[in-house]
Curated annotation (Swiss-Prot):
Family: Belongs to the mitochondrial carrier (TC 2.A.29) family.
Biased composition (Gly residues): 7-17
PANTHER family from the UniProt entry: MITOFERRIN-1-RELATED, MITOFERRIN-2
Annotated membrane topology: Multi-pass membrane protein
GO MF, one example: ferrous iron transmembrane transporter activity
Catalytic activity entry: Fe(2+)(in) = Fe(2+)(out)
Membrane spanning stretches: 72-91, 133-152, 170-189, 227-246, 261-280, 327-346
InterPro entries according to UniProt: Mitochondrial_sb/sol_carrier, Mt_carrier_dom_sf
Region described as Disordered: 1-28
Species in which this protein is naturally found: Mus musculus (Mouse)
Protein name in UniProt: Mitoferrin-2
PROSITE patterns per UniProt: SOLCAR (PS50920)
């Protein structure tokens, strides 16, 4: 429908009301018009007549560009919900990935593919065995993803304004993703250590507190961050590839950057698959550092494995070049729906929260 431009006295023809539109919707559209005209399409002063503005009442304005809607709190809440849901839904596959990355697995824990692994784990170890350690993962994922998305959105906008004013910069997207990863991994690394030790075959830990206590007493507090540098070495390129691929695909499938669930799912899934396959060798080394796999240690290594270089040498000594790609199938299968869930849930909650904030402001 066509809505006349606003003058100093109001919208010509009355408020942005129409048949079938509630007072709240009318107030919301009225607020959008007021902000748009106040700025002036051609840089004119507020109060000058503006040409007719066409708005699609179904989609509204570009939700990512609302001037005061998407606050840091919005990104943090949306990111926390997305992170928790992502990890909870995909946790059984993550358990399989950890086991398939084992360098010298027990004969009872040698799996041909993801489905066989899940079936055998549930049949021989119990229906809920693939979910062991989920509670500590969810506890870490909430704050980690809140920091992650809030930092990413803030830096993406700041760097894009510097590198490519008025446009979108792939370099800014990649750099923002890298910096956001520093905060995410700092919050998530201890939970990763505990989670992966509980996921291993014949793990002696049945409760999170048992695992935390044993690691603290036997290896010290530093064990919770032993894999931090390797995690960063893996996640920084992973997130750079991930964010750059996602934003690149969004430019093609959703150039107007409106809330579009199908584009968020598709772009997130593709970005996750590409990034996961490219960084699998680093993920194998991270798993070794987190678990300190006893069979690998007993074979030809003494003491604890510390640092990325040591992990790379150990992986090669035990399994050769092919060992760097153990679990690549499970990792890609995990990341495709995982990143699709994360982006779609994050964008949905960002859209929902922003819309509610705008409705509240318009009704004041």
């Amino acid at each position: 429908m066509e809505l006349e431009g606003r003058s100093a006295g109001g919208v010509a023809g009355g408020p942005a009301a129409g048949p079938g539109r509630s007072p709240g919707e009318s107030a919301l559209l009225d607020g959008w018009l007021q902000r748009g005209v106040g700025r002036g399409a051609g840089g004119g002063e507020a109060g000058a007549y503006q040409p007719p503005v066409r708005l699609d009442p179904e989609s509204g304005p570009e939700y990512e560009a609302l001037p005061a809607g998407a606050t840091v709190t919005t990104h943090m809440v949306a990111g926390a919900v997305a992170g928790i849901l992502e990890h909870c839904v995909m946790y059984p596959i993550d358990c399989v990935k950890t086991r398939m990355q084992s360098l010298q697995p027990d004969p009872a824990a040698r799996y041909r593919n993801v489905l066989e692994a899940l079936w055998r784990i549930m049949r021989t170890e119990g229906l809920w065995r693939p979910m062991r350690g989920l509670n500590v993962t969810a506890t870490g994922a909430g704050p980690a993803h809140a920091l992650y998305f809030a930092c990413y959105e803030k830096l993406k906008k700041t760097l894009s304004d510097v590198i490519h004013p008025g446009g979108n910069s792939h370099i800014a997207n990649g750099a923002a993703g890298c910096v956001a990863t520093l905060l995410h991994d700092a919050a998530m690394n201890p939970a990763e250590v505990v989670k992966q030790r509980m996921q291993m075959y014949n793990s002696p830990y049945h409760r999170v507190t048992d695992c935390v206590r044993a690691v603290w007493q036997n290896e010290g507090a530093g064990a919770f961050y032993r894999s931090y540098t390797t995690q960063l070495t893996m996640n920084v390129p992973f997130q750079a590839i991930h964010f750059m691929t996602y934003e690149f695909l969004q430019e093609h499938f959703n150039p107007q950057r409106r809330y579009n669930p199908s584009s968020h799912v598709l772009c997130g899934a593709c970005a996750g698959a590409v990034a996961a396959a490219a960084t699998t060798p680093l993920d194998v080394c991270k798993t070794l550092l987190n678990t300190q796999e006893s069979l690998a240690l007993n074979s030809n290594i003494t003491g604890h494995i510390t640092g990325m270089a040591s992990a790379f040498r150990t992986v090669y000594q035990v399994g050769g070049v092919t060992a760097y790609f153990r679990g690549v199938q499970a990792r890609v299968i995990y990341q495709i729906p995982s990143t699709a869930i994360a982006w779609s849930v994050y964008e949905f909650f960002k859209y929902l929260i922003t819309k509610r904030q705008e409705e509240w402001r318009a009704g004041k």
